[in-house]
Regions:
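Core alpha/beta nucleotide-donor-binding catalytic domains of modification enzymes
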Residues: 2-124, 134-138
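Short catalytic/ligand-binding loop motif for oxyanion handling, primarily in non-cytosolic enzymes
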Residues: 23, 87-92, 136-139, 168-171, ...
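Short gly/ser/thr-rich secondary-structure transition/capping motifs
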Residues: 60, 159-162, 238-243
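Short clusters of hydrophobic/aromatic residues that line enzyme substrate/ligand-binding pockets
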Residues: 64, 89, 169, 197, ...
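Extracellular/periplasmic catalytic domains that process cell-envelope and extracellular macromolecules
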Residues: 73, 170-172, 250-253
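Conserved Class I SAM-dependent methyltransferase catalytic core
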Residues: 108-171, 177-180
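Flexible, glycine-/basic-rich loop-and-beta segments that form/coincide
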Residues: 168-222
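C-terminal target-recognition/interaction regions appended to catalytic cores
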Residues: 212-286
Length: 286
């Protein structure tokens, strides 16, 4: 490469892209997105809105051949990102199957991770990162993953367990990042709820902030949340191994609880549910 030539950016594809949180982090780090794959129509449309210049396929990953990806990318793929569904593995799911073997091989959603390994094996990227919940690697789950990646030529993989609140996320969030590289992340100052919510105007009044509008309480929340103390919840429900809380009133001086698929929160200073934008900020979306 000559001094006057343009340096090539590292490229990535995003499997199970959702609205694009994983892609956002990598593009902010200077990587170039080549393709996003997402089966959910609303999520795929949101991704396209967030990344208007990106190619988005609203398709089932099970039906996609790796050659199609290579043809679309028209160049080497450096990184494969993947966030397959966590429902088969999370302890918050009361219908989670009993053993890791059943979760990977009998649950159709759990088996999707093998389509990730199929594509990784075909594309041979410089590195891959698979994000999911920590229980995916419970007991035999870790050995199932190791054996699958040994089969496609990756003899050593790393199970990177990261507590995201130590790296700037304003809510407790323990995540697993499976990769062929060890992720060495520099800790950041913890952020409290007030640092990410209280600069927003009340959604009761007109504003031009995306997804920041007032949401009514559902009928199951008693007295529209009146009387709930900070840090306490109005609704409790059973997961596969523990009791979970919902409609928790946040404490602005603390971190938010772990956000799950159906988690909803009450504003710490106003008696109302959080807006969609406020909820996103608790997960460190801008």
């Amino acid at each position: 490469m000559t001094s006057g030539s343009k340096k090539r950016k590292f490229s990535f594809i995003d499997l199970f892209s959702g609205a694009g949180g994983f892609s956002l982090g990598f593009t902010q780090a200077g990587f170039e997105d080549r393709l996003a794959i997402e089966i959910d129509d609303s999520a795929a449309q949101t991704y396209k809105l967030n990344f208007p210049n990106s190619e988005v396929w609203k398709r089932d990953i099970c039906s996609i051949h790796s050659l199609e990806i290579l043809e679309e990318a028209s160049d080497e793929i450096d990184v494969v990102l993947a966030s397959p569904p966590c429902e088969p593995f999370t302890a918050a799911n009361p219908r989670r199957k009993k053993t890791p073997f059943e979760r990977f091989y009998e649950d159709p959603q759990g088996a999707l991770i093998f389509h990730v390994s199929r594509i990784v094996g075909d594309l041979s990227p410089k590195f891959f990162v698979i994000e999911n919940v920590v229980p995916l690697a419970d007991s035999d789950g870790r050995e199932i993953i190791k054996e699958e990646f040994r089969r496609i030529g990756y003899n050593k993989i790393h199970f990177n367990f990261i507590s995201c609140e130590k790296y700037g996320c304003p809510s407790y969030r323990n995540r697993l990042f499976i990769s062929n590289v060890h992720l060495d992340v520099v800790p950041q100052k913890k952020k409290k709820v007030e640092e990410v919510l209280l600069d927003l105007p009340s959604p009761s009044y007109p504003n031009n902030i995306p997804n920041h509008f007032r949401i009514p309480f559902p009928k199951q929340v008693k007295n529209e949340g009146i009387g709930i103390r900070k840090g306490h919840a109005d609704v409790y429900f059973k997961g596969s191994s523990r009791e979970n809380r919902n409609w928790t009133k946040l404490n602005e001086k603390e971190l938010a609880p772990t956000i799950m698929g159906k988690s909803r929160f009450i504003h710490p200073l106003e008696n109302r549910p959080l807006s969609v934008r406020e909820q996103a900020r608790l997960m460190s979306f801008p």
